[in-house]
């Protein structure tokens, strides 16, 4: 059964992890106080603030306290949906102002079009919001890559470390599990995808990266179908 769709992880696979941590995370942490003050009456932002209070079990937390909680979550790389939603909104602002572009590994930029020419669908799956993924790929070093994508999945689909998230993706794209290839640098994610029946490849971009018993590639140019 041939591959009909590829699901790619972002950080460490299509995107340098250092760009995520040093540029995007740092930018969002610094921008949070002013962004929340200026946008707290926005319905989406207000919902996120309420969700932060609920998750932190601090229903009466002030806006300043919510900022503290969010900045702590950024430090911990917490996979909390309200944080990821707010980060996406803040990054949208940063991209629009031209304060940074989205780093994408050149081998992915060079390969994505040839993958599509083989009638293979491409999806991304990240703990970052779908909106943040679209921003990353639309403002990339290689220009707007979003026309090559068929969809983006985030934490609303499920936790990347658990089988159910990948089952949900399979159901959404309406393919047999073995027709879907998941590519990630993270062993635990690959295990979960494998449990769901997907084919897997581990992206290994550095010599000191933790590896497992998965087929490995160091570049998207190594893909063969």
From Swiss-Prot:
Its cofactor is Mg(2+). It holds the Pfam family Hydrolase. Its EC number is 3.1.3.77. One of its GO terms (biological process) is L-methionine salvage from methylthioadenosine. Keywords: Amino-acid biosynthesis, Hydrolase, Magnesium, Metal-binding, Methionine biosynthesis. The keyword Hydrolase applies. It catalyses: 5-methylsulfanyl-2,3-dioxopentyl phosphate + H2O = 1,2-dihydroxy-5-(methylsulfanyl)pent-1-en-3-one + phosphate. InterPro entries: Enolase-ppase_E1 (IPR023943), HAD-like_sf (IPR036412), HAD-SF_hydro_IA (IPR006439), HAD_sf (IPR023214). Binds 1 Mg(2+) ion per subunit. It comes from the Bacteria. Signal peptide: none annotated. GO terms for molecular function: 2,3-diketo-5-methylthiopentyl-1-phosphate enolase activity; 2-hydroxy-3-keto-5-methylthiopentenyl-1-phosphate phosphatase activity; acireductone synthase activity; magnesium ion binding. Pathway: Amino-acid biosynthesis; L-methionine biosynthesis via salvage pathway; L-methionine from S-methyl-5-thio-alpha-D-ribose 1-phosphate: step 3/6; Amino-acid biosynthesis; L-methionine biosynthesis via salvage pathway; L-methionine from S-methyl-5-thio-alpha-D-ribose 1-phosphate: step 4/6. Belongs to the HAD-like hydrolase superfamily. MasA/MtnC family. NCBIfam families: enolase-ppase, HAD-SF-IA-v1. Monomer. PANTHER family: ENOLASE-PHOSPHATASE E1. Bifunctional enzyme that catalyzes the enolization of 2,3-diketo-5-methylthiopentyl-1-phosphate (DK-MTP-1-P) into the intermediate 2-hydroxy-3-keto-5-methylthiopentenyl-1-phosphate (HK-MTPenyl-1-P), which is then dephosphorylated to form the acireductone 1,2-dihydroxy-3-keto-5-methylthiopentene (DHK-MTPene). This is Enolase-phosphatase E1. It comes from Shewanella woodyi (strain ATCC 51908 / MS32).
